[in-house]
Amino acid sequence: MAQMVAMPVAHSLSLICNWAKSNPLSRNTLALPASNTPNKQSLSIRCARVGGVEIPANKRIEYSLQYIHGIGRTRARQILVDLQMENKITKDMAEEELIILRDEVSKYMIEGDLRRFNALAIKRLKEIQCYRGVRHIQGLPCRGQRTKNNCRTLKGKKIAIAGKKKVSK
């Protein structure tokens, strides 16, 4: 039988669970299994690593691939079609299938390479001082959205400006 450890708890917990009547220990303690007891049923959770990212093991491949930056719904479906692979749960994949999936994903620009590419593209726009580059520099939207009322994400928090005060005579 597992060892038990007594932990102090609030009176309300013992009253809610009606635990105080059956407890051989004092009224303010709660017995829990000791943490140093060995667990015979070890739980093994295997996360697959694809494209430098640990994708969730308990989801289908189509949705797991979307955790990789640069792979969305369409690209994930296209990868499965190209490999002629069924959309099963990630942890049920064989090691060979995982290797083939890694090879296919590595053909695309993902994660750090994609982020670097986008950052360099924005930097180039800023250097040539085109309209989009200037809007990036100013921290404003560059795709034609109105800025009078919205675009708080780019402009930041609203700053209160003191208006004209009426002078009392």
Curated annotation (Swiss-Prot):
Listed HAMAP family: Ribosomal_uS13
Organism phylogeny: Eukaryota, Viridiplantae, Streptophyta, Embryophyta, Tracheophyta
SUPFAM superfamilies: S13-like H2TH domain
Protein name: Small ribosomal subunit protein uS13c
Keyword RNA-binding included in the entry's annotation: yes
GO cellular component terms given for this protein: chloroplast; chloroplast envelope; chloroplast stroma; ribonucleoprotein complex; ribosome
Assembly mode: Part of the 30S ribosomal subunit.
One record GO biological process: translation
Family annotation (InterPro entries): Rbsml_uS13_C, Ribosomal_uS13, Ribosomal_uS13-like_H2TH, Ribosomal_uS13_bac-type, Ribosomal_uS13_CS
Protein localization: Plastid, Chloroplast
Transit peptide, residues from-to: 1-47
Leader sequence segment: none
Pfam family, one: Ribosomal_S13
A single MF term (Gene Ontology): structural constituent of ribosome
Protein species of origin: Arabidopsis thaliana
Family, similarity comment: Belongs to the universal ribosomal protein uS13 family.
Described function: Located at the top of the head of the 30S subunit, it contacts several helices of the 16S rRNA.
Keywords per UniProt: Chloroplast, Plastid, Ribonucleoprotein, Ribosomal protein, RNA-binding, rRNA-binding, Transit peptide
Gene: RPS13
